[in-house]
Amino acid sequence: MPATTSTTLLASTTFGSSTGNYDGSAAAFNSDKVKGDGYYGFSDGVHTVQTRVTSLIGTVKIQGTLVKDPATTDFVDIATVVQSDGSTAITDSYLNNFTGNFVWIRIAVSEFTAGSINNIFMAH
């Protein structure tokens, strides 16, 4: 295992176009879970997440769990990456650093009514 692992948390997702766990019309969905530091037994628990959005109206959160075989309800919010006011479209890039020996990490999207989440990557 390399010292740093880079993973796609969420591939490009555009409102109205079905891709991955997004059906093209839902206002809320979760990405697939990906392995965090805790899965590999890393002791530092440092994660960095990069997010790019274009004309987004919605909320994007990072969630994690310490459970090895989690149910959807086992995930907790770690950070809110971007949150629009429901009418103003946001175009920006974000970096989030957080520490925790999370076994699994995922992205939770809600209030998604327009725009694109260009991609979300994680390094740990």
Where in the sequence are the language-model features?
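Beta-sandwich interaction modules
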Residues: 27-30, 34-44, 77-124
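Short proline/glycine-enriched turn/loop motifs at strand-loop junctions of beta-rich domains
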Residues: 54-59, 112
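Short edge beta-strand/loop segments characteristic of extracellular beta-sandwich folds
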Residues: 48-52
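Short, surface-exposed beta-strand/strand-loop-strand elements in extracellular ectodomains
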Residues: 57-78, 119-123
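Transition segment at domain starts
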Residues: 1-43
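Residue-level detector of short, conserved catalytic/binding motifs and their immediate flanks
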Residues: 47, 60, 105
